[in-house]
Amino acid sequence: MRDTITIAMCGKGGVGKTTTAALMVKTLAERGDKKILAIDADPAIGLSYALGINVDKTVDDVRNNLIQKVKEKKIGDRDDTLRMLDYELFDVLVEQGKFSLLAIGRPEGEGCYCEVNTLLKDIIESLSSNFDVIIIDGEAGIEQINRRVMKIVDHLVLVSDTSSKGLNVAKVIKEVAHDNQVVDYKSTGLLLNRIR
């Protein structure tokens, strides 16, 4: 069994979470001694582009396909559903040299990303034993923290610029994660970007 290290980038939009995650993935991949999973948990799919990967299928595509098959009664019980989900998720996983990428995608409907975030949480738990390091590029704000998507994270990296809004979002994320015990993390840190 692997002792997987999970690192999550969180913060306000536009502060450099995606760039930081991409640099971390590339640096670890260049070392070549770890099996890495990059998770593009931001619906804007920025990490995929930053890593130079064209994503054909996302977690949300799998979710929509699964919903359709359940409606059409093309799959049976819960075990059948889980087996199909497991198979489809490995189809979504893009292997790129020394790392793999999983993109959450952009839900088609209006409203919140609750269903796809819940699925993402289960996927992270399911896939973690197959990798040495998981790097998550989270969506902007506190949604994925509140929804416990990042329930088990070793290192919570709060990325911010020097603006009061960016620093406040980082502070709120840390408070929510700590005070509400929604993230079980070993360490947290603040990475300041765009310092002049």
Predicted regions and their residues:
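Cytosolic-facing regulatory segments adjacent to core modules
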Residues: 81-96, 100-138
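N-terminal phosphate/diphosphate-binding loop that engages ATP/GTP or pyrophosphate donors
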Residues: 30-96
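Conserved catalytic-core segment of NTP-binding enzymes
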Residues: 115-196
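Walker A/P-loop phosphate-binding motif and the immediately C-terminal alpha-helix
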Residues: 5-43
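Alpha-helical scaffold elements adjacent to nucleotide-binding pockets in ATP/GTP-utilizing enzyme cores
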Residues: 24, 46, 50, 169-173
